[in-house]
Amino acid sequence: LTPVFGLEDVGGYGRDVALYLIEQGYFVKFVNSSLSNSERNSYAMTQKNDSWDAQCVANVLIRQLPHLPDTSPSDIHWVIGQLVGRRNAIIKAQTALKNQLHIQLNYHYPSYKDFFSEVDGKTALAFWESYPSPSHLKGVTMEGLRTFLLEASNNACSTRKAEKILLFVQADGEVKREYQTSRDFIIQSMVRNISYTKQEIKKMDTELKVTIQKLGMQLETMPGIDTVTASALIAEIGDIHRFTNSDKLARYSGVAPIKMGSGGKETMKKTKQGNRKLYDVFYNLAVQQVQVSKGSKIPRNPVFYAYYNQKQSEGKSKSQALLCIMRRLVRIVYGMMKNKTAYILLRMPETKAS
């Protein structure tokens, strides 16, 4: 007899267990938690404890052994997933810091939103750190502020920007309060933190680019796919060879509709099942494919834009047409990942969007 192990978790804490068992020569099957949960709820009296969970996993393993996927942990896909997760965590922290900075700046500079186009831009951060409150601008001439802004912005900001800021500060009036030094320190601390996270994101993007290149894929040759998007696709899909065709990848990502019916009547319905993170990646990618340049009105990807309009002319709504784009993208991405081919943008007669 050859023992077979079934594990619910093969990507998190259970990954090391799966690797150890495989190295010892055992067969390890991945049991989706939804299957064991369905097994648990199939009994009249439900319970939840470790031993019963193990029994439910074993029951699923016995009944569905031929249909359960083998566990084959891939180090590079796992590492890419960890890098993507870390990057997302930094982005989330940066967003929280930016929101906190908005709150603090509102106390010090009521008109701060009119100072710079981006509150966390390079020049803006330099200004907030040097002048966290209007009291630091006392005695600063327009020429002095202009010189500071020119240096911080690499000669992008002019005298007009310095004049504009000083006029807004004057119009806002006195905003100095008790413990102003501590309040200023809070803003300066946030600025340093935001600057640090920006540097970390750049380093993370560089590391991701180097790592995904080891797979030999050319996903970034497709319009709309940069290093971040390519990394997200690889992290969520994993080893592409575990999907025998693009239809299975479409079902896994929740892009493919499911069959619903009763009493001999059946229809295809959009589903919210599948990997929703992967679904979001394909959705955002589909939106980019049908984008149109604001100035020239030329579509970013003429082929997909024409296909998008074709589906709408057939009676589909915009969301339905976008879903058709997503399904086609799944097929293309599947082929590019499996065969490690580049995307070839077909040339079409340039037509401006209406």
Label every PLM stretch briefly.
Residues 1-354:
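A detector of single, family-specific signature residues
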